[in-house]
From Swiss-Prot:
Superkingdom of the source species: Bacteria
Protein name: Homoserine kinase
Organism expressing this protein natively: Bacillus thuringiensis (strain Al Hakam)
Alphabetized Gene3D superfamilies for the sequence: 3.30.230.10, GHMP kinase, C-terminal domain
Localization per Swiss-Prot or TrEMBL: Cytoplasm
PANTHER family: HOMOSERINE KINASE, HOMOSERINE/4-DIPHOSPHOCYTIDYL-2-C-METHYL-D-ERYTHRITOL KINASE
Length: 297
């Protein structure tokens, strides 16, 4: 019998100008199945060898930081979220670790507490809040306190173009400027404000326009993801609302009318044959837990 299983959705962050603030949960998933107690933590997985199988694994290390008194268990981890592709793989692992601690340690954490803890680990709320809450989230971290608003976007379809090449988040962040001119900050913030307002009012054409006008990060990351302009042009011609980098890249994130997502994905797949084109949906449930029997420390 499976005593406890945890499912965490992938996420995309930024949506163009919503840098480190706007996130959307996606229909790719990390699954953690908790098995029996053990004398030490064991993580069963089929990922690359660089992913730890002991207490150094990000899921386990996060859980133990949240609840140091946890007894070791054997856990099995599976995932179809690509690693280091800008789809929130590390955020999903952090969220899974927090929930693992919450369940095994009987912490009774509220959703707000989970978001706060996850943001403290991640450094920004966009990916982790989306994975916890589902849907579309807009968040802000003010010192130690995080504020998050969740909205529904069920009319939207999602397409992700995933290259074979990995792109480490630290490398992608290293090309960003340390200082942002005031007039550029004003312009970039105004665009981000309109993006959020359009998301809330479901003005999808405006969302698409704003998500392609970022000044905060995409201009600096183009050298790392040179196909973005051509993908953006084709997606618009095929009927998409808008295209942006998914998180720090290298994956590309496209919003479409829900009923057109398959058609647009097929057209893009014929053009960009070197990339994996995934027709996705927005996950509206967020993290889910399935308990089969009582577990204690």
């Amino acid at each position: 019998m499976i005593p406890l299983s945890i499912r965490v959705p992938a996420s995309t962050a930024n949506v163009g100008p919503g840098f480190d603030s706007v996130g959307i949960a996606l229909s790719l998933y990390l699954h953690v199945v908790v098995k029996e107690k053990s004398d030490k933590w064991q993580v069963i997985h089929s990922f690359e060898d660089s992913i730890p199988t002991d207490d150094k694994n990000l899921i386990v290390s996060t859980a133990c930081k949240v609840c140091p008194s946890l007894s070791p268990h054997i856990i099995e981890v599976t995932s179809n979220i690509p690693l280091t592709r800008g789809l929130g793989s590390s955020a999903s692992a952090i969220v899974a670790g927090i929930e693992l601690a919450n369940q095994l340690g009987k912490l009774n954490l509220t959703t707000d507490q989970k978001v706060q803890i996850a943001t403290n680990f991640e450094g920004h709320p966009d990916n982790v809040a989306a994975s916890i809450l589902g849907g579309t989230v807009i968040g802000a971290l003010d010192g130690k306190n995080v504020s998050v608003v969740r909205i529904e976007s069920k009319e939207l379809g999602v397409i992700s173009l995933i290259p074979n090449e990995e792109l480490n988040t630290d490398e992608s962040r290293s090309v960003l400027p340390d200082v942002f001119p005031f007039h550029e900050a004003v312009k970039a913030s105004a665009i981000s404000n309109v993006l959020v307002a359009a998301l809330c009012q479901k003005k999808w054409e405006v969302v698409g326009e704003m998500m392609e006008m970022d000044h905060f990060h995409e201009p600096y990351r183009l050298e790392l993801v040179p196909l973005l302009p051509s993908i953006r042009k084709c997606a618009k011609e095929f009927g998409a609302y808008g295209t942006a980098l998914s998180g720090a890249g290298p994956s590309i994130f496209i919003l479409t009318p829900y009923e057109k997502r398959q058609e647009i994905a097929e057209q893009l797949a014929r053009v960009f044959t070197s990339m994996k084109v995934c027709e996705l949906e927005i996950d509206h449930r967020g993290i889910t837990v399935n308990k089969k029997e009582h577990i204690g420390l």
